[in-house]
Amino acid sequence: MDEYEAQLLVVEQALENATDEHQRQELLALKENLQELLSLTRGGTEDDAATDDDSQNADNLDNELERLKSELNDMEATGASKSNENEVQQLADLRTKYSSMVGEKCSAPHEHSWGAISYHNALICGVDDEVIINGDGALDARLRVLFTNPTHREMLPCSYYLEGECRFDEARCRYSHGALVTGSSIRKYNPPDFHKLSRSCPVLAQLPDRLWHRGRVLCVNFVEQVCRVRLDGQDHKERERDFKFEELFPLTTDQEDELTSEDSSSVNDGSSDEEESDMDDLEAARRARMVELSLFTFKPTEKLGAWEEYTRGIGSKLMEKMGYIHGTGLGSDGRGIVTPVSAQILPKGRSLDACMELREAANGDKDYFSVERKLQRAQRRQKKANEKAYVRESQRTDVFSFLNSSVLGSDNKQQAEPEAKKAKANDLQQHSTKTLNVETVRIADDIRRKQRDIAKVQQSLDRNTGDVQLQKRLQAQMHNQKQELATLQAQERSLSKEQQTRKSKNKMFEF
């Protein structure tokens, strides 16, 4: 009975979807038969003959139902094949349409990293092979576009890719190889209208980094087609610049609101903690950029604030608290001066033209009148004068030095050796026992090294007996080596004597 009810529901659904009149008549007849069969089954009071007839009718109904199902399946297969043919034809039409659009300008969407979507002028450069289903459930294709007014680095087209010489693929290249957008999202191209340029008009201006930055118009010269713009933000050293008309793109009210919403969503999206973390990231990025900039900056010989060596250095401490990084230039962007401003003193009674001539005569030296350079020259002159005075005083002889060198010279020579030995003995007595032990080990190593050198020289003498000149040089070298060895052995004996004396004294003081 449940099976008959399910079959009745299937027939009713088929009636709702059927469009052919003949098919509807057959389904209505089948529905009436099923309803009659259900009523007979629920009754349960008929005789066996009626029951047999009903069962026969039920079999007939089952056969008709199976035939109907097969017909429905055939109809669905035919419809599916027709729909596939329609989809193929629709896709071919789409590709033909989009292929004809290659090379045209349009307005394409761009999704930023923070989720905001904005439209920018772009150039269609190709059609993607992949087929997609758009938001309406229809077939669509994707177009590859290059933005003509990129405002962010991920939108900037790769110049090598445009020339066909980029060595990186789309995932590894830092620049854009074209953004993929759906064909249904393409809008009409917005050409720039330079007649709208006026004071305080919002514009996009192209800087040397090939990015387009927002700004406000200060004044316009339509004759020379030049416009002065004040750039937004604090990342530009020269906020007010002159741009030609081809380097500008006037913004409408809707475009300005869209760009403003982008910036506000990128900065104000999230909670206050996220804002603080974003500010920290911006500060860290700023400091990293300044440090990177300092690596490519000319390093002077004198660092900024070197004079604080003689002071407490309060100036550098205050600058560090205000965010200054040592080694970078002055200013918030680190692009200011690195070398300190040197004081200059011009000659007295000379005009500026005469001073310029003097500087040009010195090959345009900027530090020609520098105070620091004059002080350095004066210090060098004083140093040379002191050296000459010392040499002159050392060569100067008087009566007393003459008497000491000539009359008393022999006595001094006789007393020189014992006085030197006495001084050396007194010198050894002033050192500690540990120092004497270290010196003894060092002298012993030197003696062994000197003995090895003497043995090598002796081998050379034995090997070169026929060469007279070489024999003389080797013998002189042998003589010098033996003298040095004798000196080292004498030092070793002196150290041993001093150590033995100290040991004897220690034994005498023991009770």
From Swiss-Prot:
Location of the protein in the cell: Nucleus
Which parts of the sequence are C3H1-type zinc fingers?
157-180
Q: Which region ranges are annotated with the description Disordered? A: 254-281, 409-433, 478-511
Q: Which UniProt keywords apply?
A: DNA-binding, Metal-binding, Nucleus, Repressor, Transcription, Transcription regulation, Zinc, Zinc-finger
One GO CC term, this protein? nucleus
- The cysteines covalently paired via disulfide bonds are none
Pfam families attached here?
Answer: G-patch (PF01585)
Where primarily located? nucleus
One example of the protein's molecular function in GO is: RNA polymerase II cis-regulatory region sequence-specific DNA binding
Task: Indicate, by first and last residue, each region the UniProt record lists as having compositional bias (Basic and acidic residues).
Answer: 414-425, 494-511
Which residue ranges does the record assign to the G-patch domain?
A: 311-357
Q: Where is the composition biased (Acidic residues)?
A: 271-281
Primary role: Transcription repressor.
What is the protein's given name?
Zinc finger CCCH-type with G patch domain-containing protein
